[in-house]
């Protein structure tokens, strides 16, 4: 290409960038990216470009498109890592492990199970890209989860993405529960409990169960402490305790009995830009894949029908 043509091409790109409005339509974003409009629609249909539909028309926020370009470029901004914090989940843990094995050294996907509220604090400080959370029954998740996010000033930049519904209840040592048992019996002095940290979704769940059955939390005998769902299940499996709040999947993973008490939503909070990051899209693909869906059946207590759907925006 001659210097004259190179100069003209550079001038066209620079002019497109300068003239682009804050919210672009299909024609404008095609001009901005120097691609045809059919390619824009293809990117939208594949969920690969930041876009929103308003009154039947697609709009493309220029700031998010710019970030998407940086993150989609080879070796681009932060394309090689994604950090997940917050609530623990066996299936999400397996998906992260599978993805890390597939990526080898090309990228880093990490998962720190530190509880719902601490996870949101870490997300707000930008020490994590994604926060996994659960906070009460599925029927109230669209009120409770956004309310948690609104406790942070950064919530205006966040969205909530549904991973799945999980069956919540009590994880029990084998043989502890029989057909004629009652929840009240689990609060007798001889039954040993795993304590969870404040701010954990499972601890919140336990408080509601205690209130519903008009029990006294002081009656519990605590012999172990856990900071994640799987740690609590491990404490029971290794004989340190008899009961802990948790999901069916964690109980199944560690060979425990399970007392079902309801379903909850398990969501991911993140900025809009992260949702379109290549690594995050890859994580959703792994969760939809045959191996993770097989594991969901093995563990039990999962409903993955809404996986990847955006359920709330600020």
Task: Kindly label every feature range from the protein language model.
Residues 77-78, 94-172, 176:
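N-terminal segment of the mature folded domain
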Residues 22, 154-169, 252, 256-285, ...:
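Periplasmic-binding protein-like
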Residues 78-88, 183-203:
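Short loop->beta-strand "edge-of-pocket" segments that line small-molecule binding or catalytic clefts
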Residues 26, 50-72:
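Short helix-start
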Residues 135-149, 233-262:
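A ligand-binding cleft/hinge motif common to bilobed small-molecule-binding domains
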Residues 65-88, 96:
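A short, Lys/Arg-enriched interface patch at domain edges and termini
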Residues 2-37:
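Polyanion-binding surface elements
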Residues 163, 172-193:
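Flexible hinge/capping segments at coil-to-helix
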């Amino acid at each position: 290409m001659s210097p004259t043509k190179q100069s003209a091409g550079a001038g066209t790109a620079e002019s497109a960038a300068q003239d682009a409005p804050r919210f672009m339509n299909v024609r404008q974003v095609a001009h901005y990216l120097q691609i045809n409009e059919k390619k824009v629609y293809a990117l939208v249909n594949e969920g690969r470009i930041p876009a929103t539909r308003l009154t039947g028309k697609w709009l493309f926020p220029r700031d998010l498109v710019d970030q998407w370009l940086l993150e989609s470029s080879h070796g681009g901004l932060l394309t090689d890592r994604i950090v997940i914090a917050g609530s623990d989940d066996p299936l999400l843990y397996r998906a992260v492990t599978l993805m890390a094995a597939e990526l080898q050294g090309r990228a880093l996907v990490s998962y720190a199970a530190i509880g719902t509220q601490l996870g949101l604090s870490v997300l707000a400080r930008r020490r994590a890209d994604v926060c996994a959370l659960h906070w009460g029954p599925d029927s109230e998740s669209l009120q409770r989860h956004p309310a948690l996010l609104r406790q942070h000033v950064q919530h205006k930049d966040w969205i909530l993405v549904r991973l799945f519904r999980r069956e919540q209840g009590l994880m029990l040592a084998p043989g502890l529960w029989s057909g004629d048992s009652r929840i009240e019996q689990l609060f007798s002095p001889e039954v040993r409990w795993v304590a969870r940290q404040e701010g954990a979704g499972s601890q919140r769940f336990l408080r509601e169960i205690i209130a519903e059955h008009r029990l006294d939390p002081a009656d519990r005998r605590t012999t172990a402490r856990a900071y994640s769902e799987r740690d609590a299940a491990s404490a029971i499996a290794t004989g340190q305790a008899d009961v802990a709040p948790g999901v069916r999947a964690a109980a199944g993973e560690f060979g425990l009995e399970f007392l079902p008490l309801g379903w909850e939503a398990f969501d991911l909070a993140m900025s809009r830009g992260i949702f379109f990051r290549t690594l995050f899209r890859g994580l959703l693909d792994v969760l939809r894949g045959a191996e993770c869906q097989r594991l969901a059946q093995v563990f039990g207590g999962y409903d993955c029908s809404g996986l990847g759907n955006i359920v709330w925006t600020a």
